[in-house]
Amino acid sequence: MAIVPKRKTSKQRKRKRQTHDALKVSTLVSCQNCSVQTIPHVTCKSCGFYKGRQVLKVKSS
């Protein structure tokens, strides 16, 4: 025999449990060097700067 729930899960209980399943909106900050929107605590992909100093060499196009 399979395991069966003893009581029906109410809409309120189900929805309260599902409140944490939503995707979070990621925050963006502007780069101090080139003012491009980037993810915080990550090297800027357009200029290669992180915390005011050059970390990556970026090919200029």
Swiss-Prot record:
SUPFAM superfamilies: Zn-binding ribosomal proteins. Keywords: Ribonucleoprotein, Ribosomal protein. Residues 1-20 are annotated as: Disordered. One of its GO terms (cellular component) is large ribosomal subunit. One of its GO terms (biological process) is translation. It holds the Pfam family Ribosomal_L32p. The keyword Metal-binding does not apply. The keyword NADP does not apply. One of its GO terms (molecular function) is structural constituent of ribosome. InterPro entries: Ribosomal_bL32 (IPR002677), Ribosomal_bL32_bact (IPR044957), Ribosomal_zn-bd (IPR011332). Residues 1-18 have a biased composition (Basic residues). Belongs to the bacterial ribosomal protein bL32 family. This is Large ribosomal subunit protein bL32.
